[in-house]
Amino acid sequence: MLSLVLALTAAKPTVDVDTILREMTDLRLLAQRPDPWYRYRQWTSYDRNMANDPYANGDAGQFLRTEEHDGRQERVMADAKGPGAMVRLWSANPVGTIRFYFDGETKPRIETDMAALLSGKNPMFPEPFSYMASRGANLYFPMPYAQGLKVTWEGPSDVAIYYAVGTREYMPGTRVTTFVPASLGKAQRAIDAAARGLVPVTPNAPLSGGTVPAGGVLEAKFDSSLGGELYDFAVKVDATDDKAKPWEDPTQAHNVLRKLRVRMSFDGETTVDVPLGDFFGSAVGVTPFESLPISVKRDGTMVARWSMPFRRNARVWIENGNAEPVALSMRAQKRVRLFTPGTYLFHARWHSQTRSTRPMYDYTYADVKGEGRFVGVGLQVSNPVAAWWGEGDEKVSVDGEAFPSLFGTGTEDYFGYAWCDPTPFSRPYHAQPPTPNLGNMGQTQNSRYHIVDDVPFKTAVRFDMEAWHWADVACTYATTAYWYARPGTTLSEDPDPKTLLIPDAPLPKPVAGALEGEDLKWTVTGGFTEIQSGFPQLSGQRQFWWREPKVGAVATTAIRVPAAGRYEVFANLGFARDYGRFSVQVGSFPPKEMDFHQPDLEWKLASLGTFDLPVGETVVRFRALEANPKSLKGMSMLGVDYFLLEKR
């Protein structure tokens, strides 16, 4: 009898680096009840003043406490007790030193430069586990611990860092092998396998379909007496976006995709109901990206690799809600999978809302009752103004808890990037594909998939995101939530067909007749130049930018005069706290001294003077003068949006 008890005890799963590395890439595991069970928790720098102001926004430089170690002042970012594992770390501004103390030890097992750790430059955690994504610094790598983990930060006193530490909290008694940096070599095979597995592989299997009439359906049905799963769902739609057509044209790809509705039922239970493009994280037309569970190919093929189990039968169908027929093809592959009491069904639900951003409010992505695992979201934003739309924090509450297990620091922070950066990126667990926008104005698509950082729940999960926009404006947020749950789970409300339209967010057009500074040829005798973008208020959304010129340095360009005559020459120039004083000379006429320093960033149309100019090119020179005494750190920048000639 004793030997039997020992055998049963030994059979309990042990958590270590290898086991969690497998979870990073094996999507089938998400469709099963976690064994051992765990709760997911996020430790962040969120504003602690939430009790007094629910939308407080001081989300940096907040820590649990300060401790002294060997004369150092270390700020505690996370302090997890009991068996667990850190699986995710993010920061918008990683500087200083980060330390990891395992199992109550007084000496850190890891002590390293935070920026290197989160950018793929630490040899222990190279890409694809550590990397930058549109200015967001990310690390996805398991660090398990048997008794606890404390993460601390030491850095400059004038820097307030943004951070998020994601940890699993296993049940007491769970057997966990604590992370040992020197022993990572033993896990090299598993590390290599995970690195390969993070690169998605799409089966080279054909799609089938045809022309689906208005109101028609393309469907596929599956049966299995042994239990089964769908594991490769792909769709291709014959539709493209044409800039020459109006945004509202019903034949535009983004409108066609919104009115194609993908639905899925497993054993008679409908669990998926999402507009087709949104389901694949590609609401605004065909927007290519590659992530582990979902990819959108450049040829328009959209692929989902989620595991979708069923006990007896499954049905997948696409309804054409367009007024015209649509040519589309589909692929859904099946394989045998035993359906056990711990097997979950795949779910996805969509909602959209256009609403004034004042007063601020919480937008609910999902509100689910039952047992399961929350595994991701997609967000599509139609923002009609240049102001930032995503200051809001995520609030994810599990099993009715009083305070959310996940409380974030900003919408883009949740999606793994930072500083409102609109630059497209694709990573295994998150993406921001290219969309028609200008900085933060226009259309944006974000996706994040919780694979190794999924959120298990026993009775309920609610995912809210603050709709925190810098402007008072009607902004559209459309969201798709993905989760797994036991059969019979209570779902979020059904989508409202009235909200299908993706609102147009027209982008500004260039100033008529402008000679764009970014398009002109420039020569400089010192400093650094670049074409700066991301400002919708600029004529071509870009400017010529000259940084760090020394006194006396000259930037020279030439503007084309269409015909000889008398012209007033204007320039749209940048003014800011770090912009400088310059002598501006048109042709051989006397120069004009100009000071571009002011507290706030702004572009102003300034007259350089009225001149008799010959046909052809006229030289314009900017000579750097002593910086304004009030300039930030004595800096002296120059920004040229465009020149404009007006006949006099």
Name each model feature, range by range.
Residues 1-11:
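Sec-dependent N-terminal signal peptides of Gram-negative exported proteins
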